[in-house]
Structures are given as structure tokens and as C-alpha cells.
């Protein structure tokens, strides 16, 4: 597999290099040189396969012979060890539930596949994963790499800005997992990660790698569950499929669009954000004008400068698709709460991120179409807000219950690179 740097097309790397480096020169994102396509017949045949076999086939189309098929399938089996069911919400709407993994969020798919790829590629070489999280990434990455040999993980998160349960899920592990609460917002955490990757000495000393949705292995893994969703739908809905994606860093939407470029029948996508609506405003008037990030109920989407957007634009350019074909919506907190109550009346307990996606979908779905919205996290991960909004008590799934009483092991740091650098050099 060959990939190129979106900021410098002359920088070309293999899959292994892209996974190991995370980012290219000047913080450029890597993008596949070849965009494979399956025929309609091949797609139909693939949709009959089981999740793991099909996923290995999809990933192999991108990765090629860099990783032998049987090793790839074995690694996929280890990564995707849980289902991605479509729950029926209304006669014309389903929710693709991506929260049945160990940390109850969609990031388990990408995080675990990336961990499998990195450990396969690195062999005996030590690696340090540095990533920023607004909640779910941290947990997924921590659990994916926990206890794996030769890997150290450092996770930055905005202090007091993620739910207490989210914090318990990944800040109680210890071992090879180091968590750092930063005095600042998610964008401040992202900025620290960028500074670290610009520090050549630190990069070399620690074998630095990023683990957020910019890593190509995570992005490729996420393509697979779109195929799994379509495989569960009745034949007659497949050609009228509209998918609404709750969007923060836009990795999930990028993966969905890549699935479409492979030949998966998706009529259109909707990018659903909260009031951090840089992309909806851009799609509306062509002006890219990020505002200060606002805290919302759907906190994993509190991102005003989405990292993956350049990949979306590149895919549209390469496929000669029109950006105006992409649906969009920005949903405020009041509407989010109202929508969660509506879903509850339909017999479906949801959380803020999925509610944003459902709202956008319901408002834009035409008669005769079938809508899917992505359920990116288990409602219990947002227990406090979900209980307050719905006025009912949620049971904690065992994954959360067993961590609820453990002590937090995080370091507290200011949003200051020198302090972070010192911590990382001292703990290598």
C-alpha cells in the first residue's frame, strides 16, 4: 500500500510507515494512493461473509501484500471480537450500535485494530503512543494497548471536561498506560500533541506515535462496520440508504465515505455536529471560519477544527464528487435533549451524540428512504446527563461497574509543553 502526505504529495510512504509515523511532514495527513473499488457482484458476495472475514478482505484491498492475508485475518479477529448490531428504532430508521466493545464506544474498533497493526509492525522496537482525547479515544486506546509488550501510552485529556465514568474507564489502569489531566480544553490538548510531534529529539527518543483518528489504521478499521451495517439490512433498503454520522474530528464520516468509494451502496451521508459547527457552516456558505470551541452535552464532538476534514475534501476531489451532495446539520443542546426524550418514547434509550445524528437524519430523510444513524457510545458512558434528561436510572454495564470505585492514577499538568516534555522524558 502506498500513501501520500496531503500537504506534500512527494512524501510517499508504505502502510507500515504511515501506521508508525501517524503524521507526515508539516503535520500532513496520509491518504491512500490507490482507491480500490469492488464490483456490485463482489459487494453482494462480501455482504454474505461474516464480519471478520469480510473486514480482512476490505482491509487487504488497501493494505495489499504488506501483511499476509492469514496474519491480517488473525489480527482482525483479535481486534473485532465483538458485534456491531443494527437496532430497529422505527420502520424506516435503525441505529448502528458501535458500543459493544470493551470500552463501550465505536473507538474500540479503530483502537484495537491499530494496536494489532502497530505491535505487528514494530516487533521488538519500543513505541510510545501519545494522544489527546475528549473522552472515548482515551479509553479505547488505553484498553487496546494495555499490557501489550514494548508499548507505552500517554493520554492527554481536558481536566474536568470528560464524564467521571469516562475518566474511570481509562485513568485507573496504570501499568503501561500514563494519563495526564491538562488544565485546558480539548484543542489545548491537541496543540500539546502537535508540539510533541514537532520535537524531533523527543520523537526519536521515545519512538512517538499518535493514536487518534488521524492514524490511517484506525480509519481503515472504521470502514468495516459500514459494510457490517449494510449486511444486516434487507435487500430492498440497501439502495435507498441514508447514513447520519455524529461528527467531531470527522474520522467516522471519512471512513463512511471511503466505504462508499469502495462501492458500498450508500445514497448519501449527513454530517451531524453540535453547535461546534465549523463544517456545516462551511458546507452552507463556503467559508472556513472556526469559532472558539463550546462545551456541549455531546462532548466528544466539541471540536471546532476537525483533523480529518482535509481527507474528506481529498476524497471528494479524487472521486469527482460534489461537496454539495453531503448533507449536514448542527444540533443544539436543547434539541439534543428533546430528541433523547423522543427516542425514549420510541422505546430506544440513547445518549447525546447518537441523538444529534438521529435528529439530523429524521429531519432530512425522504419517504421511501431507509436511515441509519451511528450509536457511537453506550448511554451509560454519559450516565449523569442521560439520567437527568430522561428521568430514569441506568444500570452500569460490567465494563464500567468494575472500574467505578478504583482510584484515578492521572497526573495534573498545565497546558504547557515544557511540563509535558519533562514528564514524558522522565517516565520513558
Swiss-Prot record:
Annotated pathway: Amino-acid biosynthesis; L-threonine biosynthesis; L-threonine from L-aspartate: step 5/5
Key words of the record: Amino-acid biosynthesis, Lyase, Pyridoxal phosphate, Threonine biosynthesis
EC number(s) reported in the record: 4.2.3.1
GO cellular component: cytosol
N6-(pyridoxal phosphate)lysine modifications at: 107
Root EC class: lyase
InterPro entries (alphabetical): Ser/Thr_deHydtase_PyrdxlP-BS, Thr_synth_N, Thr_synth_N_sf, Thr_synthase-like, Threonine_Synthase, TrpB-like_PALP, TrpB-like_PALP_sf
Cofactor(s) the protein requires to work: pyridoxal 5'-phosphate
A Pfam short name: PALP
Function comment: Catalyzes the gamma-elimination of phosphate from L-phosphohomoserine and the beta-addition of water to produce L-threonine. To a lesser extent, is able to slowly catalyze the deamination of L-threonine into alpha-ketobutyrate and that of L-serine and 3-chloroalanine into pyruvate. Is also able to rapidly convert vinylglycine to threonine, which proves that the pyridoxal p-quinonoid of vinylglycine is an intermediate in the TS reaction.
Protein name (database record): Threonine synthase
Amino acid at each position: 500500500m502506498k500513501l501520500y502526505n496531503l500537504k506534500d504529495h512527494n512524501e510517499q510512504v508504505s502502510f507500515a510507515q504511515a501506521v508508525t509515523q501517524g503524521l507526515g511532514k508539516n503535520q500532513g495527513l496520509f491518504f491512500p494512493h490507490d482507491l480500490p473499488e469492488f464490483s456490485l457482484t463482489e459487494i453482494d458476495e462480501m455482504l454474505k461473509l461474516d464480519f471478520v472475514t469480510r473486514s480482512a478482505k476490505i482491509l487487504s484491498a488497501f493494505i495489499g501484500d504488506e501483511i499476509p492475508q492469514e496474519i491480517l485475518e488473525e489480527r482482525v479477529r483479535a481486534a473485532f471480537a465483538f458485534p456491531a448490531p443494527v437496532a430497529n428504532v422505527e420502520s424506516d430508521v435503525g441505529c448502528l450500535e458501535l458500543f459493544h466493545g470493551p470500552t463501550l464506544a465505536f473507538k474500540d474498533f479503530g483502537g484495537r485494530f491499530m494496536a494489532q497493526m502497530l505491535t505487528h509492525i514494530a516487533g521488538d522496537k519500543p513505541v510510545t503512543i501519545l494522544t489527546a482525547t475528549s473522552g472515548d479515544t482515551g479509553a479505547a486506546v488505553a484498553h487496546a494497548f494495555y499490557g501489550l509488550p514494548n508499548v507505552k501510552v500517554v493520554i492527554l485529556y481536558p481536566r474536568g471536561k470528560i464524564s467521571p465514568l469516562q475518566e474511570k474507564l481509562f485513568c485507573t489502569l496504570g501499568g503501561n498506560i500514563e494519563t495526564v489531566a491538562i488544565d485546558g480544553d480539548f484543542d489545548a490538548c491537541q496543540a500539546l500533541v502537535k508540539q510533541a510531534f514537532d520535537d524531533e529529539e523527543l520523537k526519536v527518543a521515545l519512538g512517538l506515535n499518535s493514536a487518534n483518528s488521524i492514524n490511517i489504521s484506525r480509519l481503515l478499521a472504521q470502514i468495516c462496520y459500514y459494510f457490517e451495517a449494510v449486511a444486516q439490512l434487507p435487500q430492498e433498503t440497501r439502495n435507498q440508504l441514508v447514513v447520519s454520522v455524529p461528527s467531531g474530528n470527522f474520522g467516522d464520516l471519512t471512513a463512511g465515505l471511503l466505504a462508499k468509494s469502495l462501492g458500498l451502496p450508500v445514497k448519501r451521508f449527513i454530517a451531524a455536529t453540535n453547535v461546534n459547527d465549523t463544517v456545516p457552516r462551511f458546507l452552507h456558505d463556503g467559508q472556513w471560519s472556526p469559532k472558539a470551541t463550546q462545551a456541549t452535552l455531546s462532548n466528544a464532538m466539541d471540536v471546532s477544527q476537525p483533523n480529518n476534514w482535509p481527507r474528506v475534501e481529498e476524497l471528494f476531489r479524487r472521486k469527482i464528487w460534489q461537496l454539495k451532495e453531503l448533507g449536514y446539520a448542527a444540533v443544539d443542546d436543547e434539541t439534543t435533549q428533546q430528541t433523547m426524550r423522543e427516542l425514549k418514547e420510541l422505546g430506544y434509550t440513547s445518549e447525546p451524540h447518537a441523538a444529534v445524528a438521529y435528529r439530523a437524519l429524521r429531519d432530512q430523510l425522504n419517504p421511501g428512504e431507509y436511515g441509519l444513524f451511528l450509536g457511537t457510545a453506550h448511554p451509560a458512558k454519559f450516565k449523569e446527563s442521560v439520567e437527568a434528561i430522561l428521568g430514569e436510572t441506568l444500570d452500569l454495564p460490567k465494563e464500567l461497574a468494575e472500574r467505578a470505585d478504583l482510584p484515578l492514577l492521572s497526573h495534573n499538568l498545565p497546558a504547557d509543553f515544557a511540563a509535558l516534555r519533562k514528564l514524558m522524558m522522565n517516565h520513558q
